[in-house]
Amino acid sequence: MRQRPPFIVSASDLPEHSHAYPQSDEPMGPSRRLGAAAGLVRLGINLQRLPPGTRSSWPHAESDEEEFVYVIEGAVDAWIDGTLHRMVAGDLAAFPAGTGICHCFINNSDREALLLAGGEAAKAVNRIVYPVNPSRRVDLKESDWWHDAPARELGGHDGLPDALRPRKDI
């Protein structure tokens, strides 16, 4: 059998990477960097696993990088500008650059979810804003913070998975 070219990769052959934001011990859902492994440099494509009670990232918006998330398996809550929207397998959410649409994905279900997340790879001109976590600004270079992000009204949800809230029945 012929060896496959390096731009054909199998997700199962790639390590999972997980991260937590500085000054936080909350792990974000682990992902496999498919695009980078296949040699893409201008497009990031990640296979992200969201166990119950986790989220993809902190709520954020980007100035110059388009992003998308496609639900492969399970169900997640798309946190869009402070309001939750249920997404199931086959649903896609797209975030055009510069709109200021703040987003993250939360697994409040009791089953694991699998997402395909993609977007333009780190552009030097891109800026980011974390409206629910303004303390994140101190972890970034001043030039990386999106100071003039479009003002968008935020709903009442705080962007946290239900599992991170104190239980009321105790």
Map each language-model feature to its residues.
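Short hydrophobic/aromatic patches on the structural cores and recognition surfaces of FHA
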Residues: 74-76, 90, 105
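Short beta-strand segments
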Residues: 57, 85, 126-128
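Ligand-binding loop in jelly-roll beta-barrel domains
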Residues: 97-125
